[in-house]
Design a protein with these regions (language model features):
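Short coil-to-beta-strand
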Residues: 99, 222-229, 405-414
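Active-site/ligand-binding neighborhood in enzyme catalytic cores
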Residues: 130-264
Length: 440
């Protein structure tokens, strides 16, 4: 063990834990990341699928890694490269497809095939979404205040929050109507929001996918419109709204973070599950590992989810009953599944022509928002989705390091999938998804 006493110990080596550790180490603190696996990365890990094939185990594309984090942690210095892709597509059962391109004119012509009105409306839609992104982005870096608290810190936080909107108003950015529109947008379903702009089912379905992917929401769910923003506010190489592949898989991100941490004197203690957080006089002061070792720290950060933190590694006696019950009743339900497929060759799609830039990005299988909501209804009722929403990509087109020469790797993300206690039933839904792919 490198040290037994630190300024800060971080339980869990996912990308959030590593980012926190890197900033603290850069500030001169003695930091340790404690990870149960023999490797760090959490949901951003690159693993070997078959000899020669690399796959991203969970997350699969990159956009929301903030550019300031990229710069501050010098991630490019430690080998991180994001490769942008130029388009995406939704494939329909009748052989048609809607392609979404980063090029304005190509995108206009693609939408106009389905609706000239929608092609005209898309520019207004894009401007409105970008306006919401500009409002939200600064808030993501603010610590949210507790509106029920009278602590000076929270009161000051609320004042800062109010000042932010007041300043926007003074600059002509947010008037009374704009504030109303923003609050309305945050609470809308993505279905209702898109209905205000578009008439084509495939255009609406393509855009709605960004609001439900990786969530336990359907396109009719209130609040799903807000999720859409997270797929527009990211950027790659300064291009806002762009997406890309991390060269070598998503694990290259956390590998670069780990290198940055070590370069600033931080430690990574891998293969060391934490079984208990030590608490004395209502303050955490260390952890106990599975092998019985103890690591002490002045401050403790948990990169685990709220349930694992307070129900698994903190003893119940250390928590107020109302807090314990609130955490126990907090819903965390998985709704997504992922297939990683090694390919002998590139698929030949019935709809997307060979060489079309739309084929380099994310490819969706769905017919309409109504079909997506039906898949969500199946999941809510405890059934496997009969017509699941599929979001797939082939990173090896842009990044040949992911597969042997001439071969390819396909990532397939599926909405909606039953929770882990039903994994014994996976063969049938996996066959269904594979059949959907083969039909395209």
């Amino acid at each position: 063990m490198p040290k037994t006493k630190y300024d800060v110990a971080i339980v869990g080596g996912g990308h959030n834990g590593l980012t926190t550790a890197c900033y603290l180490a850069k500030a001169g603190l003695k930091v340790a990341v404690i990870e149960r696996h023999s490797y760090v990365g959490g949901a951003a890990v690159s693993r070997e699928l078959h000899p020669g094939w690399t796959y991203s185990n969970c997350s699969y594309v990159c956009s929301l890694l903030r550019p300031e984090i990229f710069r501050d942690l010098e991630l490019s210095k430690y080998g991180l490269q994001i490769i942008p892709y130029e388009g995406s597509a939704t494939m329909l059962d009748d052989g048609r497809f809607y392609a979404h391109y980063s090029d304005h004119d190509l995108n206009y012509r693609s939408i106009a095939q389905f609706s000239k009105k929608d092609a005209e409306a898309y520019e207004r839609f894009g401007k409105d979404v970008m306006r919401q992104c500009k409002i939200i982005k600064p808030l993501l870096k603010m610590t949210p205040p507790d509106p029920t608290s009278f602590r000076p810190k929270d009161i000051m936080g609320l004042l800062e929050f109010a000042k932010y909107f007041a300043a926007k108003d003074e600059l002509g950015g947010l008037g009374e109507k704009e504030i109303y529109d923003t609050i309305r947008f945050w609470t809308m379903s993505v279905r209702d929001y898109l209905e205000e702009y578009f008439e084509s089912d495939v255009v609406k379905a393509h855009l709605a996918g960004s609001a439900i992917i990786g969530t336990a929401l359907g396109p009719y769910s209130p609040g799903s419109a807000y999720v859409l923003l997270h797929h527009y506010m990211g950027e790659v190489d300064g291009t806002v709204g762009a997406w890309g592949y991390s060269r070598g898989g998503m694990g290259s991100i956390t590998k670069a973070m780990a290198a940055s941490l070590k370069a600033n004197g931080g430690d990574i203690i891998a293969g060391s599950p934490v079984t208990k957080i030590l608490i004395k006089n209502n303050r955490s002061h260390g952890v106990v590992l599975e092998n019985g070792d103890e690591i002490f720290a002045d401050k403790l950060v948990s990169n685990l989810d709220v349930k694992r933190t307070f129900l698994k590694v903190v003893e119940k006696k250390e928590l107020p009953d109302d807090f314990y019950n609130a955490v126990k009743n907090f819903k965390i339900r998985g709704s997504s599944g992922k297939l990683n497929i090694a390919l002998d060759d590139l698929p030949i799609w019935k709809s997307i022509p060979e060489g079309d830039p739309a084929g380099t990005g994310d490819l969706h299988i769905t017919q309409s928002i109504e079909e997506m909501e039906g898949a969500y209804d199946d999941w809510k009722d405890g059934r496997w989705s009969q017509f699941p929403y599929v979001d797939m990509c082939i990173p090896s087109i842009n990044d040949p390091t992911m597969a042997p020469q001439g071969k390819h790797y396909m990532s397939v993300f599926v909405q909606y999938v039953r929770s882990e206690e039903h994994t014994s039933e996976l063969q049938s839904p996996c066959n269904l998804v594979c059949r959907l792919l083969l039909e395209k």
